[in-house]
């Protein structure tokens, strides 16, 4: 690893002088991922009710799509960006990197359980074309004290990129992502591991053909492959293509848009079609009151005709307080790729249906002097086909939990607060409670505490997660999850990081259960080096 660091540092010294002195763009529209940039907060991850334990195995480079009906725990309110940070750039990016048209970030790490981690990203933030290119590789083998090669492993590889430029007045936005995740099945069932590959290309054109008017079109694709490895491997293939056309008019006080979309999906050769036609609007009644809405028609081969709509009202009586109320009838299109990544220990339902139903949300936010923020809210929803693991039917033919789509109601309240007096210093807390029947392996109460402090060259951070209120008929590990870490700023370009995760699991007297009998990695330590060039 030392040799790699030396090579990367040498490459940074070889950058042309012109690349070091260019001015930063006013409004860069390629956002840099904070998973690379904010190492002092790297262990902080958003809790979700969709796939408990998924976030504990590998820190995801990007947020995974949530299955229908599973609302997230309110993320801690983000610290307001420092005054010197241009809009659109994360506060963790060093000032010298923001002033260069080309920036590179690299992160290398290794730790217990044969943990290897590498992430490299390039960003073109100057004149067009603007671009982003990122590669990630991470592996764990021998989780929870098991022998390496025994099926207690996890590997994730990602390659993604984006390109933005103009052809005359037409804005062009191209992006693509390739992801591969292999998870050992821990000796359950006839297979060794489950391999998931996804490829998601997309292209969008936007033409402002007249003042206030914009015509846009996009073409998105999605390709997902699942492979159960073993002496008799089994596979599944899903392919989807979706064109869309939209027209929008924006005035100083309101905007109005219409769009149409078609999607064709092939799941192991079986075709299904979806089509939507909808309109949306937004009105600023004053600086303090904004109303937005949408509505239209949705048709699917399996769902038939549906008529979703949504209304939201935001009231901001003063800069410190805002209230958001929303509700309507929504349709959530679920695909194999979404479900495979969100439910790692479950088999796909057959067929995969759209989930639809009524919902209402209410959220209030209070902030004070840009250092303190408090957020609280409630969610209520009804679902016609929400995914839910069936514990009574475990194990399925492949040693996994059958996943069925059921009718269910969901209700939850949540709150979070954050105090951030300085850039590297913060304290936050998040709480969520389920008020209605919730899926197995989803806690009834979630509590998370996070904190960190930074000085000129040193910093520490930690997190504590407490999950309670599980179904007593299932086996769980109730021991809180404690993680600690720290960093040393060796130079302007290099930061060294040490992390220790799940330090309290030895008190449980056994491995930490994810979806019983599947286990999580458990106590582990990692050393990393982050380099900004």
Regions found by a protein language model. Give the residues of each.
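Outer-membrane beta-barrel translocator/receptor signature
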Residues: 87-88, 97-159, 168-170, 180-182
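Residues that define the transmembrane beta-barrel architecture of outer-membrane proteins
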Residues: 100-102, 114-118, 153-159, 193-201, ...
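Transmembrane beta-strands of outer-membrane beta-barrel pores
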Residues: 108-112, 126, 137-141, 167-169, ...
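Residues on the lipid-exposed face of transmembrane beta-strands in outer-membrane beta-barrel proteins
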Residues: 120-124, 161-165, 201-207, 239-249, ...
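Repeated loop/turn-to-beta-strand initiation elements of outer-membrane beta-barrel proteins
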Residues: 128-132, 169-174, 210-217, 250-258, ...
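Flexible loop and strand-edge segments within Gram-negative outer membrane beta-barrel domains
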Residues: 141-158, 175-210, 220-240, 269-270
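Outer membrane beta-barrel strand-and-loop segments of large Gram-negative receptors
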Residues: 349-353, 359-365, 373-430, 446-448
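Outer-membrane beta-barrel "beta-signal"
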Residues: 494-495, 519-533
């Amino acid at each position: 690893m030392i040799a790699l660091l030396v090579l990367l540092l040498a490459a940074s010294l070889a950058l042309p002088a012109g690349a070091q002195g260019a001015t930063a763009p006013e409004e860069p529209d390629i956002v840099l991922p904070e998973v690379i940039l904010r190492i002092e907060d790297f262990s902080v991850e958003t809790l979700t009710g969709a796939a408990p334990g998924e976030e504990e195995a590998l820190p995801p480079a990007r947020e995974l799509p949530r299955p229908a009906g599973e609302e997230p725990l309110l993320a801690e309110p983000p610290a307001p960006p420092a005054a010197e940070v241009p809009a659109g750039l994360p506060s963790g990016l060093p000032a010298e990197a923001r002033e260069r048209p080309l920036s590179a970030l690299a992160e290398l790490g290794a730790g217990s359980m044969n943990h290897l981690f590498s992430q490299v990203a390039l960003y073109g933030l100057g004149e067009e074309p603007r671009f982003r290119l990122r590669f990630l590789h991470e592996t764990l083998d021998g989780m929870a004290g098991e022998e390496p090669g025994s099926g207690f492993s996890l590997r994730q590889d990602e390659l993604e990129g984006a390109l933005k430029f103009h052809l005359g007045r037409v804005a062009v936005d191209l992006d693509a992502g390739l992801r591969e995740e292999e998870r050992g099945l821990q000796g359950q069932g006839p297979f060794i591991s489950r391999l998931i590959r996804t490829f998601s290309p997309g292209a969008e054109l936007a033409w402002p053909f007249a003042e206030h008017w914009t015509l846009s079109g996009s073409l998105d694709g999605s390709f997902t492959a699942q492979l159960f490895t073993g002496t008799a491997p089994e596979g599944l293939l899903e392919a989807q293509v979706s064109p869309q056309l939209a027209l929008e008019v924006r005035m100083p006080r309101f905007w109005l848009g219409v769009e149409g979309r078609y999607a064709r999906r092939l799941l192991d050769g079986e075709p299904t079609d979806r089509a939507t036609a909808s309109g949306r609007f937004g009105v600023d009644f004053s600086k303090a009151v904004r109303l937005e809405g949408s509505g239209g028609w949705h048709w699917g081969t399996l769902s038939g005709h549906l008529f979703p709509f949504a209304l939201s009202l935001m009231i901001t009586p003063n800069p410190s307080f805002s209230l958001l109320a929303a509700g309507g009838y929504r349709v959530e299109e679920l695909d194999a790729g979404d479900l495979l990544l969100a439910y790692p220990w479950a088999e796909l339902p057959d067929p995969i249906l759209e989930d639809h139903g009524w919902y209402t949300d209410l959220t209030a936010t209070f902030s004070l002097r840009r250092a303190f923020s408090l957020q609280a809210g409630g969610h209520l929803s009804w679902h016609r086909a929400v995914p839910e693991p069936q514990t009574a039917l475990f194990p399925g033919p492949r040693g996994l939990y059958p996943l069925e789509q059921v009718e269910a109601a969901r209700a939850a309240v949540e709150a979070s607060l954050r105090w951030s007096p300085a850039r590297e210093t913060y304290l936050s807390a998040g709480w969520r409670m389920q008020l209605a029947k919730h899926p197995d392996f989803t806690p009834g109460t979630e509590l998370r505490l996070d904190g960190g402090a930074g000085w000129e060259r040193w910093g520490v951070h930690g997190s504590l997660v407490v999950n309670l209120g599980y179904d007593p008929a299932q086996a769980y590990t109730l021991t809180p999850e404690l993680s600690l870490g720290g960093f040393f700023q060796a130079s302007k370009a290099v930061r060294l990081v040490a992390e220790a995760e799940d330090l309290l699991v030895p008190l449980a007297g056994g491995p930490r259960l994810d979806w019983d009998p599947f286990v999580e990695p458990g106590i582990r330590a990692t050393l990393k080096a982050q380099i900004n060039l």
